[in-house]
């Protein structure tokens, strides 16, 4: 057999450790970054929304807030401080948090309270509406909040609009709760901004480019716009026919322009219907559906209301004030443009209403020129949405893992909200929601929460976030999860919910602190921070590997006692092979911790010690009970277990020598189990597999009490899990359950169940499930099997049990990737579902062949073969419940372990064995599998067979072995479970070697009996054990007979000689399965304890069993494996000569420790540690060496094989880390994008706020502005004009600085204000400054425009006059650059025009760089393209633009601006010289 290279293994383990450490550090950093970003996002969003509300107040300039107060409030908002709620509310924070949480989750109550407040004329209803949006629903950043708010709006339609006498008037007034909330929601909805920008940006920019005239369609108003002299010049003499005719011509011309403009808007509206926000569409369709049912409302009126909501409340405000929505950012909108936009908005609304109401007769003529259904069709699309009950989510939820756990609310808002609710309660408007509100208010403290005085004195600049802000479980990220992300997975509790500081309090000079009040949700698990064991366990449970260790509570992070268990080493277990796995798992990657003691400490922490003590105590008591029972039935004698019997004698080379009385003979089962385990071991002798059975048993311990006792605090704590559970009750219950369970299918693996959830085991779990995942004994084989069926037998099991169901629903369910294993699982399903063995048989085949060669230790084929044979035993023997129980306890392995094993077993079973001795070997191999596994296999494989198969065959074949085993059992019986040898698992040599082995062992070991020697206490114990086992077996036999059809099927299974073997194995499997089931529970039941004690020596490592106390043997293997993994993953490989291994009688010689490869490796490492004076490492290595020295070479090879197998099985953990990292990176990127959006919104609101303030300032200076314009007209020299403009701007800047409104402005605001003043002033004098020579300039521009138009017809990108390099022609004709320069007319100040030119040049350079990434484009490449772009775009007034900028901005040009300006003027000059005729 191939030898496992310890150096390679160490290398891989070290790489794994380094990778895992770095990934964990990165994940920790990412978690911190995500939290910081989320916190910043929520705080910024809270402030931004308050600024927007403040802006609305400024625009309305209501009596309550003067512009100066709004400005002061804006400044205060920027300095908002966020403080944990308890600092002001003290212990009452919890009550308020619960109140807010329950209120938030009751949209109906909120809606009815707001309506009731309006009916009662509560003056603070509006501020409460703001609080609901900004605080309770956190500005709807999270989809959960958005969904709640949509429900509130739906209830408001029902309670407010539906009940109103004139809902349309109520809606148009815009002061009802629905209107305010809808406005807040639609303004903040990002998808709404996207829709508005996509729809309106282009048409509005085109309108600004052509804004020369008011598009007035009312003749009377048209005339009023001109002074008398202008009227006469334009229309002729007033009152004449010519005058009226000219006026009519102008009106028609304006109408034609307006129709073209509006059609452009409608076209964009239709084109972008696809991106209309789903949530708004849902609200509109809900309104239509709800109000259509009202008898007094006609359909036309309902439709008109939907039109009002859609156009008057959503689209038209954005058309009229695009700057406020960020649709237009840098192009100022002058008076003419604003008027034209208002005309467009008015026409859109009228067009939407065509057919539903008679329009203004004056507009009929213009409306007649439109397609009647143009806007109505858009409305139909929106209303036509199916009115489903649940609100849609606005977009793909990239923040799935995030959830809000706090509310941001100021103290005054909180008090206002509570008082509002109390006043609503006292009023009589609530109807059926009264009770709900009463319950909510009942829990609030009667008095107002007091502000702590300290708060007022200390400003909290950096209030802490409440704990809620932590990324929570991203469990779905487990590699195993099929879903890339389940909602819970990423649960990141961002507590930052920006709740608003009360909008109304503007007078305060100190910023009002915003309280961060926790909603009371518990802290969640952080993505990527699950331990290795948890991840691996989770995979098992979700993957359906019989192992269902993690209960749903655990998945959700709820505390549960089962948690402790599953935490132990389960993780790895599940994933890693089996028993050994468990042990491995213990040391799981957490090894990182590098301190051994940390390894075990999972949630269970110190449970280990207590558990051990408990176990010992219980063991003692139960032992007595078992002894009593056994004595009653004289089981020992029946089993033929005599103290002196030498094992070697018992073993006969053939199975059939002894005739067993009947299948029901208790000893048969036990013996068989043992035999099988032994046989498996034999076959595997050579294999690296770790101790055959021992591994499993050990694992069991993890789950079960067995191990836990043995477990040392430092290394094995993890293993203890189930032990810590209260022993007595559980055991009793479980035993009862087992008894009541019928058949394999129905019996549930207690361990499994328990781990799955804290409830008592459910019969539904099939034994099989327990079996599969863990056998470490045959790592290779198993691995292969596992790879084939990673979920091992238990696959469906998990589904069957209720617990599993829960788990599957759990957000964290991980499903292992589909693999052959799934098919295997499917085959095994029947077991889980109680259907009986028959279905099970199919899978055998799969197990036979490993899916891929084992990476490390190869496994003997023999080990794999023989599955079939095994199973049958089961059947013929029909284990009684008692037997099963005993067996189970003997091997108590966690189901998980069993699972993987079973796969191994199954594989071994598969091979038919014709020759008894050959059969025997497979049996041994099987034995090597953890018995649990064997069991699992059996149950899985067993199919109904004729029950005729002769017990005698079985018995004869295995009797001798069985006898031997029974002796062992005997000795085992009296020992505390931890001392027992784990018989079934113990590997045995192939039969031919068996006797020799025995003899040698006898020589070497203390007692005649190999097992007894293992336990170190020979015979006396055997009899007690035998009795106990028999007793238990009997008990269960009867139960099985009574209850389990599947057992019957199994019994039938053994029909052939091969079956004999099968029977053994199946029995074995069954037992072990049972054991596994029992294992999870600590042995409290007396029978159970005894059974636990039955753990047989076979389960122990060979050398350990011979040399050490049984107690040590059971534990030492796992312990050694854990420590060895730690040593290997921290070692630097040092080469040393390959050792030769001498073998004696076909067995590795374990007498010469110096031959042990591991020991030699460790010695080198110790030498290095001494050399480096690394005391910690020295201590760890020496302790590891002490543990390893006890084992013989064969066991050491098994140890390495087991570690290698565990290494392979940890792949899902690596995948989990990778997915968590990717998920966190995605979340972080999305949060940053959200933050960008919020910051942009805030910037837009602040700029518009500044613009409104400037407008107010300029209105107060209107007289001065008129004087300035008159003076400007009189000037002729360009320099004088420039100087005059500069002087007047400086005058206005000074006036602004002295204005009370601007006292609190920041430097940035002042700069924005100066820019706004410049734009406003230049807008007023634009025509005078742009066309100083008036008509002469206009005509000159027209000539150039026509010249360029002709050029554009003949000039192409590859025209020889341009000489554009060929490499750049692929991006021609550079449309984005053309569109940039075409908008230059929309900008009125020379600065803005230069910026427009700069953007065009930058766009061209970007496109050129894109075309040729190898070189940077230079001026020779750039200028020809610029010329071509100008020819194709042909912007109006090119010459006047050049003159305007040169006159008013030339002195300000510098740097980049100056360079691009020079290129631009050169291109214009060049264009002038091109002759289009040539």
UniProtKB/Swiss-Prot annotation:
Phosphotyrosine: modified positions: 460
VPS9 domain: residues covered: 1338-1478
Cellular compartments annotated: Membrane; Endosome
Phosphothreonine PTM positions: 390, 458, 470, 762
Keyword set, alphabetical order: Endocytosis, Endosome, GTPase activation, Guanine-nucleotide releasing factor, Membrane, Phosphoprotein
SMART domains: VPS9
Modified residues (Phosphoserine): 227, 466, 566, 569, 742, 746, 757, 766, 876, 902-903, 908, 914, 966, 1019, 1046, 1096, 1103
Tissues in which the protein is found: Expressed in erythrocytes (at protein level).
Any GO BP annotation: endocytosis
Region (Disordered): 574-608, 739-820, 846-874, 889-1023, 1043-1064
Pfam families cross-referenced by the UniProt entry: DUF5601, RasGAP, VPS9
Record-level GO cellular component terms: cytosol; endocytic vesicle; endosome; plasma membrane
Topology of this chain in the membrane: Peripheral membrane protein
Site positions per UniProt: Arginine finger: 172
Oligomer status and interactors: Interacts with TRIP10/CIP4. Interacts with RAB5A. (Microbial infection) Interacts with P.falciparum (strain 3D7) CK1.
Entry similarity comment: Belongs to the GAPVD1 family.
The name this protein goes by in its record: GTPase-activating protein and VPS9 domain-containing protein 1
Species classification: Eukaryota, Metazoa, Chordata, Craniata, Vertebrata
Gene that specifies this protein: GAPVD1
């Amino acid at each position: 057999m191939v030898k496992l290279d310890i150096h390679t293994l160490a290398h891989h383990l070290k790489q794994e450790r380094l990778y895992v450490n770095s990934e964990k550090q990165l994940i920790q950093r990412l978690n911190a970054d995500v939290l910081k970003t989320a916190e910043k996002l929520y705080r910024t969003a809270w402030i931004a929304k308050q600024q927007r509300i403040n802006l609305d107040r400024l625009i309305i300039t209501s009596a309550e807030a003067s512009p100066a107060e709004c400005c002061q409030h804006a400044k205060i908002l920027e300095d908002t401080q966020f403080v944990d709620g308890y600092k002001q509310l003290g212990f009452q924070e919890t009550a308020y948090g619960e109140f807010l949480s329950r209120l938030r989750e009751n949209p109906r109550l909120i809606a009815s309270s707001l309506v009731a407040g309006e009916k009662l004329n509560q003056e603070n209803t509006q501020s409460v509406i703001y609080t609901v949006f900004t605080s309770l629903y956190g500005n709807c950043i999270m989809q959960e909040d958005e969904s709640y708010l949509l429900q509130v709006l739906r209830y408001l339609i029902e309670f407010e609009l539906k009940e109103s006498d004139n809902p349309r008037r109520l809606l148009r007034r815009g002061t009802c709760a629905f209107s305010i909330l809808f406005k807040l929601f639609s303004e903040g909805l990002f998808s709404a901004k996207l829709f508005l920008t996509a729809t309106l940006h282009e048409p509005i920019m085109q309108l600004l480019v052509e804004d020369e005239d008011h598009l007035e369609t009312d003749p009377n108003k048209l005339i009023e716009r001109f002074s008398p002299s202008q009227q006469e010049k334009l229309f002729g003499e007033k009152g004449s026919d010519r005058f009226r005719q000219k006026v009519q011509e102008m009106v028609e011309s304006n109408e034609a322009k307006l129709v073209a403009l509006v059609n452009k808007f409608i076209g964009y509206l239709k084109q972008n219907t696809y991106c209309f926000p789903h949530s708004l569409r849902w609200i509109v369709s809900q309104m239509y559906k709800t109000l259509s049912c009202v008898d007094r409302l006609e359909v036309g009126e309902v439709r008109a209301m939907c039109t009002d909501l859609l156009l008057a409340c959503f689209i038209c405000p954005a058309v009229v004030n695009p700057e406020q929505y960020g649709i237009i950012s840098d192009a100022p909108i002058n008076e003419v443009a604003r008027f034209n936009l208002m005309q467009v908005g008015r026409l859109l609304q009228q067009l939407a209403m065509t057919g539903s109401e008679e329009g203004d007769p004056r507009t009929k003529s213009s409306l007649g020129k439109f397609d009647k259904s143009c806007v109505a069709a858009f409305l139909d699309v929106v209303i036509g949405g199916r009115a489903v009950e649940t609100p849609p989510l606005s977009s793909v939820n990239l923040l799935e893992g995030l959830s809000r756990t706090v509310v941001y609310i100021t103290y005054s808002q909180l008090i206002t909200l509570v008082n509002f609710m109390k006043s609503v309660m006292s009023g009589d408007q609530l109807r059926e929601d009264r009770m709900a509100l009463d319950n909510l208010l009942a829990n609030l403290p009667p008095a107002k929460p007091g502000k702590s005085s300290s708060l007022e004195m200390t400003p909290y600049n950096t209030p802490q976030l409440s704990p809620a802000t932590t990324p929570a479980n991203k469990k779905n990220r487990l590699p195993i999860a099929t879903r890339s992300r389940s909602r819970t997975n990423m649960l990141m509790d961002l507590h930052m919910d920006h709740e608003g500081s009360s909008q109304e309090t503007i007078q305060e000079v100190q910023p009002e602190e915003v309280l961060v009040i926790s909603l009371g949700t518990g802290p969640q698990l952080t993505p990527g921070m699950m331990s290795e064991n948890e991840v691996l366990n989770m995979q098992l449970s979700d993957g359906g590997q019989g192992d269902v260790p993690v209960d749903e509570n655990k998945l959700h992070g709820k505390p549960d006692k089962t948690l402790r268990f599953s935490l132990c080493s389960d993780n790895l277990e599940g994933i890693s092979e089996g028993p050994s796995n468990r042990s491995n798992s213990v040391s799981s990657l957490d090894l990182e911790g590098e301190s051994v003691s940390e390894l075990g400490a999972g949630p269970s922490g110190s449970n280990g010690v207590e558990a051990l003590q408990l176990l010992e105590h219980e063991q003692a008591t139960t032992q007595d009970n078992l002894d009593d029972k056994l004595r009653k039935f004289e089981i020992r004698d029946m089993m033929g277990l005599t103290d002196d019997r030498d094992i070697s004698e018992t073993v006969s080379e053939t199975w059939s020598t002894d005739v067993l009385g009947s299948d029901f003979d208790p000893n048969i089962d036990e013996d068989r189990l043992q035999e099988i385990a032994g046989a498996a071991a034999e076959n595997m002798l050579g294999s690296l597999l770790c101790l055959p059975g021992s591994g499993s048993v050990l694992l069991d311990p993890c789950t079960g009490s067995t191990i836990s006792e043995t477990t040392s605090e430092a290394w094995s704590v993890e293993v203890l899990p189930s032990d810590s559970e209260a022993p007595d009750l559980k055991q009793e219950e479980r035993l009862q359950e087992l008894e009541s369970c019928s058949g394999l299918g129905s019996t549930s693996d207690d361990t499994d169940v328990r781990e799955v959830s804290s409830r008592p085991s459910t019969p539904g779990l099939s034994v099989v499930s327990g079996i599969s995942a863990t056998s470490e004994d045959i790592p290779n084989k198993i691995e292969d099997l596992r790879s084939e069926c990673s979920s091992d037998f238990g696959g469906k099991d998990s589904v069957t049990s209720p617990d599993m169901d829960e788990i599957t629903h759990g957000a964290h369910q991980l499903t292992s990737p589909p693999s052959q294993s799934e098919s295997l699982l499917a085959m095994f399903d029947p077991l889980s579902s109680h259907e009986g063995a028959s279905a099970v048989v199919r899978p055998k085949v799969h197990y036979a062949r490993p899916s891929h060669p084992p990476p490390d230790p190869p496994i003997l084929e023999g080990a794999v073969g023989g599955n079939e044979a095994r199973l049958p035993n089961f059947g013929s023997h029909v284990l009684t419940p008692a037997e099963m129980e005993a067996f189970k306890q003997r091997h108590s392995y966690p189901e998980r372990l069993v699972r993987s094993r079973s796969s191994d077993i199954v594989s071994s079973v598969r091979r038919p064995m014709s020759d008894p001795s050959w059969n025997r070997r497979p049996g041994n191999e099987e034995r090597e599998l953890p018995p649990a596994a064997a069991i699992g296999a059996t149950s899985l494989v067993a199919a109904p067979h004729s029950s005729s198969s002769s017990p005698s065959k079985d018995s004869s074949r295995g009797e001798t072995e069985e006898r031997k085993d029974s002796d062992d059992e005997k000795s085992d019986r009296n020992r505390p479970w931890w001392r027992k040898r784990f018989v079934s698992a113990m590997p045995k040599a192939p039969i031919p070697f068996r006797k020799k082995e025995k003899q040698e062992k006898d020589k070497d070991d203390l007692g005649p009996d190999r097992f007894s020697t293992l336990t170190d206490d020979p015979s006396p114990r055997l009899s007690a054990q035998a009795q106990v086992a028999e007793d238990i077996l009997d008990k269960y036999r009867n139960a099985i007979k009574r209850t389990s059809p599947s057992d019957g099927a199994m019994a039938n299974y053994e029909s052939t000689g091969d079956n004999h073997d099968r029977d053994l194995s199946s029995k074995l499997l069954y037992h072990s399965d049972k054991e596994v089931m029992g294992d999870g529970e600590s042995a409290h039941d007396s029978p159970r304890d005894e059974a636990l004690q039955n753990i047989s020596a076979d389960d122990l490592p060979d050398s350990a069993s011979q040399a050490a106390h049984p107690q040590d043997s059971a534990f030492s293997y796992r312990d050694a494996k854990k420590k060895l993994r730690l040593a290997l993953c921290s070692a630097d490989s040092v080469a040393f000569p390959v050792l030769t291994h001498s073998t004696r009688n076909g067995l590795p010689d374990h007498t010469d420790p110096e031959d042990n490869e591991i020991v030699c490796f460790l010695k080198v490492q110790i030498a290095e540690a001494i050399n480096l004076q690394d005391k910690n490492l020295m201590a760890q290595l020496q302790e590891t060496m002490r543990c390893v020295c006890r084992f013989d070479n064969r066991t050491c090879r098994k140890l390495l094989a087991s570690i290698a197998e565990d290494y392979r099985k940890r792949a899902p953990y690596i995948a989990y880390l990778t997915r968590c990292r990717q998920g966190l990176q995605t979340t972080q990127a999305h949060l940053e994008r959200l933050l960008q959006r919020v910051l942009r919104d805030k910037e837009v609101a602040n700029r518009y706020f500044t613009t409104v303030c400037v407008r107010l300032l300029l209105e107060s200076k209107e007289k001065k502005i008129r004087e300035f314009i008159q003076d400007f007209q009189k000037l002729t020299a360009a320099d004088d004009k420039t100087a005059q403009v500069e002087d007047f701007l400086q005058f206005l800047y000074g006036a602004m600085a002295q204005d009370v409104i601007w006292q609190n402005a920041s430097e940035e605001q002042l700069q924005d204000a100066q820019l706004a003043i410049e734009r406003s002033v230049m807008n007023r004098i634009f025509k005078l400054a742009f066309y100083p020579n008036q008509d002469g300039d206009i005509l000159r521009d027209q000539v150039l425009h026509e010249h360029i138009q002709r050029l554009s017809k003949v000039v192409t990108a590859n025209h020889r006059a341009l000489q554009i390099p060929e490499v750049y022609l692929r991006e021609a004709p550079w449309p984005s650059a053309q569109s940039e320069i075409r908008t230059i007319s929309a900008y009125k100040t020379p600065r803005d025009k230069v910026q427009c030119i700069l953007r065009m040049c930058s766009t061209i350079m970007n496109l050129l760089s894109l075309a040729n990434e190898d070189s940077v484009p230079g001026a020779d490449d750039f200028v020809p393209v610029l010329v071509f772009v100008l020819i194709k775009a042909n912007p109006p007034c090119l010459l006047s633009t050049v003159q305007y900028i040169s006159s008013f901005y030339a002195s300000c040009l510098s740097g980049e601006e100056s360079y691009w300006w020079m290129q631009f003027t050169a291109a214009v000059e060049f264009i002038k010289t091109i002759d289009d005729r040539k």
